[in-house]
Amino acid sequence: MTNFIIITAANDKYFWLLQKFIASIRDHDAGREAPIGVLDLDLSSENIAWLEAHGARVCDPGWDYKMAKAEDNWFKAMTARPNLPKHFPGHDIYLWLDCDTWVQDWGAVELYLEGAARDGFAVTPEVDRSYDYEGFYDFQYSCYKTGFGRKMAKKLASAPIINCGAFAATADAPHWDIWSEIFGACLAKKVYFWAEQTALNVAFHTRGLEASFL
């Protein structure tokens, strides 16, 4: 069996979602003993005890970057994401899923793990022929312009969004360091909500990174 860990993050406000997320994993035969890591974004001692009783490892990641302005602890879910192997060492593959995810079909987990094992990184672009893209360009342009300037925004705003709410990567994938480098440079100048996902997209679209796109 692949040595993997599923990682997410939450604070007390979103703990009820985190509980359902963990239940959706444990409900599958393959997920009953699956390692789970939780980034502590201000969890009470009672909630941490519940997580540990359900087999989860809890980690306060601290701040991984020097930032242009201070943020509340919930922002650690963003700053820790390119650094998961550092916070939960000892695994071959790291699968990140936002805590509002529900694992309905374990086959989806396997697709991410298999994609990462094969190509180093597995992730899903937000693209489909049935999507309505009205307003999409303006949103993307704003994300790129805020963190990376007009030139980058013009170059990448029409590209599909690579969603970092669900991805898997091997511990030694080059993507981690490249993503972290780009994200850190962004945060030194501008801190904003979509910065970590925008940095990942810049990494893919400008550094020639390969992945299994699901």
How would you name each of these model-derived features?
Residues 1-214:
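Glycosyltransferase catalytic domains, chiefly GT-A lineage
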